[in-house]
Amino acid sequence: MWPQPYLPPHPMMLEESRQNKLAAAKKKLKEYQQRKSPGIPAGAKTKKKKTDSSPETTTSGGCHSPGDSQYQELAVALESSSVTISQLNENIESLKQQKKQVEHQLEEAKKTNNEIHKAQMERLETINILTLEKADLKTTLYHTKRAARHFEEESKDLAGRLQYSLQRIQELERALCAVSTQQQEEDRSSSCREAVLQRWLQQTIKERALLNAHVTQVTESLKQVQLERDEYAKHIKGERARWQERMWKMSVEARTLKEEKKRDIHRIQELERSLSELKNQMAEPPSLAPPAVTSVVEQLQDEAKHLRQEVEGLEGKLQSQVENNQALSLLSKEQKQRLQEQEEMLREQEAQRVREQERLCEQNERLREQQKTLQEQGERLRKQEQRLRKQEERLRKEEERLQKQEKRLWDQEERLWKKEERLQKQEERLALSQNHKLDKQLAEPQCSFEDLNNEKKSALQLEQQVKELQEKLDEEHLEAASHQNQQLETQLSLVALPGEGDGGQHLDSEEEEAPRPTPNIPEDLESREATSSFMDLPKEKADGTEQVERRELGFVQPSGVTDGMRESFTVYESQGAVPNTRHQEMEDVIRLAQKEEEMKVKLLELQELVLPLVGNHEGHGKFLIAAQNPADEPTPGAPAPQELGAAGEQDVFYEVSLDNNVEPAPGAAREGSPHDNPTVQQIVQLSPVMQDT
């Protein structure tokens, strides 16, 4: 708050107070004269008052007295004092006029101070505006820096994605190189696949070139953005330093103006105090004695001179203040010009900032377009990855199914082992019972024919039970083999040509229509032992089948699962697409083949144990039939019931052999004794079931 100036009293009030003071002074003089001259009449006093110019006064009696001389002296003194008072009044009026002039000058100075105050307020407002603009610039700088960081992070993420995509492309190229090497080894029938792969390779190479060009463009744009950001930061730092210097100068100037203003106010207050003291001195009544009036007048004259000197000093001070105010006005004008220049600079800077923002917006749009393109490429790569993952999941599911099938096969093997053990026990029991019966028959040759009929019935029942078991086992194995073949076909259709991204489905449809090429041995296998075992499997199986056909005269080679496995192997080999990750499946298949061979060996051992017993039993039965009932021999035209059953079983046997695409041995027609025996036929019917497991 500015200090309130001391307001002078109204001039009419001053004149009234002066007149009152003069009247009071006159009354006091009259009282004093009455006290000093009590014998003087009142009329003389009035006459003396009226005669101002007469130097001599007369009494009522016409004689002079010393009181009259004193009275005359007093009158002269009063006249001189009145003259001096009139002069003083004139001086006072002149001082009043000077005071009015001074007040007018003070009012002008106040007006100038008010204008300076307004200018300072405007400067403060401009300073506040500049501070707000500075804060806005800081916020824009922060946002630009944040956006630049965000773009840098996004560029890093995109660079990482590009690196991952490049690595993926390299892996795909490696896979394609492997596939191309495999395709070079294949026959001319795979020309369509090679053309498709070449197209896909060209597409991948084009995409890679586009990605490399896009990466170079993104790196160049990032470098440009970083350079522009550095230049913008430098420019903002320089502007900040300039604004700080300008603010410091403005604050210094404001401080100096405030100090000068305080000094002016202090001076004005001192002048007002001196004027009030002068007024008080002028207002004091002349209570001095008549001889001291001259001294009072002299003092008043001295004071008037002193006041004139002070007034002159005040005039000089006012002139100096006016000059200072003029200088301040010039400074304010210069500052206004500077502020206008600064405003123009700020406008230019705002225009530059708007241009830079437009450039940044354009760059952002470009980066967004680049991001869109990169996102599209990333989506394509993701789709390819998803397809590969789906294929991997399918392969895993197939592996799980194969594992489940292996478990089922193990369970079936365990069941068959248990059945074999039961059959062995039954055979042992039958052998023991037959031996006991033969001993009894040898001991008692007069046995009835009913026992033989019972034996025949029991044999027929056993044959029927064995047939039912065989049918059930055949149905189960056929279902398992068909299910396994379907799974292997689906697996082969999925595994065909691994590494093909978008063209995989189209190739699957073409592969179903195209004929399958000849099987070839895969070169991707790591170990040579696996390949050698893989090559030796069909030879060993062929040798085993020949030996079984020669020895057993009716054994059928195991089909079903083994044929499905062979077909899967041939398809794998023909396509040349057995990956390195499938060696475990190959080893599992080889183990299954080894187990099948072990089962064959065990069946051969069982047959070797059972055949002599059956031969002995057959010869003994023929001897008993010829001895006891020679008339009951069947006619050559009508076959015996055992032979009919054997013939039916033989038809079934040949049907199974035709379904399994295995020709019977050449010695099967020559040796007919095993076919005549039902127990041998039961064993022959059980042996392929055991071999199929």
From Swiss-Prot:
Highly expressed in seminiferous tubes in testis. Highly expressed in spermatids, barely detectable in late pachytene spermatocytes, and not detectable in spermatogonia. Detected at intermediate levels in pancreas and lymph nodes, and at much lower levels in spleen, peripheral blood leukocytes, skeletal muscle, liver, lung, placenta, brain and heart. GO terms for biological process: Golgi organization. Residues 14-611 form a coiled coil. Residues 20-69, 497-547, 661-693 are annotated as: Disordered. Pfam families: GOLGA2L5. InterPro entries: GOLGA_cons_dom (IPR043976), Golgin_A (IPR024858). Residues 537-547 have a biased composition (Basic and acidic residues). It comes from the Eukaryota. Keywords: Coiled coil. Residues 54-69, 676-693 have a biased composition (Polar residues). Disulfide bonds: none annotated. The keyword Translocase does not apply. GO terms for cellular component: cis-Golgi network; Golgi cis cisterna; Golgi cisterna membrane. Belongs to the GOLGA6 family. PANTHER family: GOLGIN SUBFAMILY A MEMBER 6A-RELATED (PTHR10881:SF44), GOLGIN SUBFAMILY A MEMBER-RELATED (PTHR10881). This is Golgin subfamily A member 6A. It comes from Homo sapiens.
